[in-house]
A protein has these predicted regions:
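Terminal and domain-boundary accessory regions
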Residues: 1-208
Length: 208
């Protein structure tokens, strides 16, 4: 990792939420801390966070909760928030709403800053294979692209193949980045510590 590299982070907020919920069973992430883990000691230029606004009329409680979260996200230094909208069809609530405009906004920002040479490394927090074409274009422009992924989602396979570097995100890496603190392990089972080898002494895996 080159400390002189200029880094921009592009976060698909919905993907981050569902990845945290599905893999780590909690969503109270401190976005600023999370991004610091991703950039390591490199130079952060900008964070772009994308999400879709929940309908106030359709889901008032979820809307208020989301607005509180957005307010906290906006406090993160060097972060720009890009908001799309959720589209509710006539089949609601039997059929969940869908996002509109998020992938286009993210792709536009990713490519615009690439062509302007505003970053050396782009870090993409997303699991959608639709970003593969944009990532390849960024690479063709001479920049590197890292993709932060949770677990081994099937949808992430194309991203793994095109990315210059894959950042495997798990609970160990996110230690210290939870707003509600660390959760205690199940006390019914004793703690086990692996043998202290050189690799076990490293807090982060080689990709980070």
């Amino acid at each position: 990792v080159d400390k002189l590299d200029r880094v921009m982070i592009f976060i698909d907020g919905s993907n981050l939420y569902h990845s945290l919920k599905g893999n780590l069973h909690r969503t109270d992430i401190d976005i600023g801390c999370f991004c610091q883990k991703l950039i390591e000691k490199r130079r952060l230029i900008r964070i772009y966070y994308y999400n879709a606004i929940v309908g106030l009329k359709q889901e008032p409680e979820r809307y208020r909760s989301q607005q509180q979260f957005f307010n906290s996200v906006q406090q993160v230094p060097y972060l720009e928030m890009r908001l799309g909208r959720l589209v509710y069809t006539n089949a609601w609530p039997g059929t969940p709403p869908y996002e509109k405009g998020i992938d286009i906004m993210l792709t536009t920002d990713l490519l615009t800053h690439s062509f302007k040479q505003n970053y050396d490394v782009a870090i993409l927090v997303a699991g959608d294979g639709d970003y593969v074409g944009a990532i390849q274009q960024v690479k063709n422009n001479g920049q590197n692209v890292e993709v932060a992924l949770f677990g081994r989602e099937n949808t992430s396979k194309p991203l793994r193949e095109v990315a210059d570097r894959v950042l495997e995100i798990d609970g160990r890496i996110l230690r210290g980045c939870w707003k509600q603190g660390e959760r205690e392990p199940n006390r019914l089972f004793p703690r086990r510590r692996p043998p202290r080898t050189h690799q076990n002494e490293i807090n982060l895996p080689p990709v980070l």
